[in-house]
Amino acid sequence: TPNMDTLAKRGVRFTQFYAAAPVCSPSRAGLLTGRYPVRAGMPGNAGSTKGRAGLAPSEVTIAEMMKATGYATAHIGKWHLGYTPQTMPNGQGFDYSFGHMGGCIDNYSHFFYWQGPNRHDLWRNGKEIFEDGKFFPELMASEAAKFIEQNREKPFFMYFALNVPHYPYQGYAKWLKYYKDLPYPRNLYAAFLSTQDEVIGHLVETVDKLGLRKDTIIIFQSDHGHSHEERAHFG
């Protein structure tokens, strides 16, 4: 993972840095509001069905605060904090949004497969879009690069919520071959982590190419630890 290692070496590494919750939605609510998840109204995961409740519009997010001071704001990637116009990213302070609103998707079909009914879940600024067969993390990197380039002359805040290494573990074929001698399921997880590292490298490369590194703060963290679920090959 050379790109993640470089971020750690060139930056400050926090060894006592805690996520707000052990599952996705409450942790993300804590991250975006700075409040304990229960106080933010998110004690557990938000429903992944359209119309279910999510992060209340009355909660003030970091995107709203940054926007109020003149920053362009973007959400790229996983949301998992609501599926209504009021609770989706554009209703929570983000000028631009691209990604999936539910907890997870297949990275190529962009369908939500957690439980039935299975449905398509890919959105740009509140409108459903279709990018059949395109690897979602690569789409994220491309969308992020466009946003950065368009806003390079002014301050911007980007919430780049990478869905890797969340299941389903769909690493690049070259990494699956590279780790073929590792025992299952470490081979799958290692391939997905190396895939994640490549995507992070593309994002940082964009920042460097545009000469923005000195004026950009990159914070790298996870919303929680690894999963022991069957879908995650029991950890």
Model regions and ranges:
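Formylglycine-dependent sulfatase
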Residues: 1-235
